[in-house]
Amino acid sequence: MKQDVILVLDCGATNVRAIAVDRQGKIVARASTANASDIAAENSAWHQWSLDAILQRFADCCRSLSSALSECVVRGITVTTFGVDGALVDAQGKLLYPVISWKCPRTAAVMETIERFISPRQLQTLSGVGAFSFNTLYKLVWLKENHPRLLEQAHCWLFISSLINHRLTGEFTTDITMAGTSQLLDIHQRDFSPEILQATGLARRLFPRIVEAGAPIGTLQTDAARLLGLPAGVPVISAGHDTQFALFGAGAQQGEPVLSSGTWEILMVRSGQVDTSLLSQYPGSTCELDSQSGLYNPGMQWLASGVLEWVRKLLWTPETPWQTLIDEARAIPAGAEGVRMQCDLLACQNAGWQGVTLNTTRGHFYRAALEGLTAQLQRNLRTLEKIGHFNATELLLVGGGSRNALWNQIKANQLDIPIKVLDDAETTVAGAAMFGWYGVGEFSSPEQARAQVNYQYRYFWPQTEPEIIEGV
């Protein structure tokens, strides 16, 4: 008997993947190929995406899975991508201008001068989204100022997930989780903001019908089915921005903060209410729409493992195993014997170490970095609790930084709450598949789909004794 699966097409900045997931959230088959942006013809410093190349990469992945998928029934397809990017298209869905990449610097000047139209504070209060130069709003203003005729000619703007969905189904739609990253919404109304659109001279007609996560978009058309090597007629279900599905796929409940720990740490929560008027007071803050109606995802981000990479390169070598650094830091007591580190190496003039003596070792420096980053997390968690109106009783940790057991224990001790570590790296795919199963009618809600998954967490409890982490 063939196995039912949801096929998740995930377009990341560095990889394009096709992953088949069963009803219990287990991965049945997967394929991946490298993804990369292209240099724009107009300017060698500019970056853009080739939609045709991305679709061909999906096709390569799906075709490499043909043997595994021949044993499966693909019940539905969902598409997840990074946020903000998209393109203007004509009535046939043909791109009028290439997809400007989030890596492209051309929109930075628009962000710096957005006050010509609307104050940055009002913009964040309405949209929730922080001032990041890659925001969709700045792309559209750039296009309006540099290619005004294209906006007049355009049938609509499609976010990158919707560009892919259009190629699959022929339908023009807007994934709500993608719109939530755009800086164009009134986040409390869950719709495009008349005030932002009017201030910037953008027409509401540019944005096609909004679809909620888990809603059917259409079915796989013949040409797309032939390209992917799949049967035509498979339902395509709305997903969208990877972050929202990673939160849901990690098992996060409402009011449970999630820390994605990597080069940057991104702290978010699924909250029933949010005070967006507070956001502009905190650099690096943002708020996106949750995958489920009625919830918000306020969050903050800061450089984290990027600081630790710098410390390793400075005091060891870039190739030194992390365990060497961890072992040296573990030998130093909590508080690093008075050595402290201000870890904001990007913006703070006082960044660096204090309290250094002739007895200070590099283990002190690394331990102080771990404790300094944890202090930064503690401040940001308190801020997020205020913005999102919740009280954290535990912290769910995902990402590469969660493999550092010493750092996990320091977090538990300094925050004085349990740290819950999920080792499964495929949270985005898991979350999107749950909405896919709901969308094809297999479950009555995404939560019921999630309840089929057996999550395995490791806990780090607050300790007053020195770190006891052997065997973890």
UniProtKB/Swiss-Prot annotation:
Catalytic activity: L-fuculose + ATP = L-fuculose 1-phosphate + ADP + H(+)
Gene Ontology MF terms in the entry: ATP binding; glycerol kinase activity; L-fuculokinase activity
One term under GO cellular component: cytosol
Cofactors: a divalent metal cation
The protein's Enzyme Commission number: 2.7.1.51
Pathway involvement of the protein, from the record: Carbohydrate degradation; L-fucose degradation; L-lactaldehyde and glycerone phosphate from L-fucose: step 2/3
Enzyme type, top EC level: transferase
GO biological process, one term: L-fucose catabolic process
Family that this chain belongs to: Belongs to the FGGY kinase family.
Protein name, per record: L-fuculokinase
Gene behind the chain: fucK
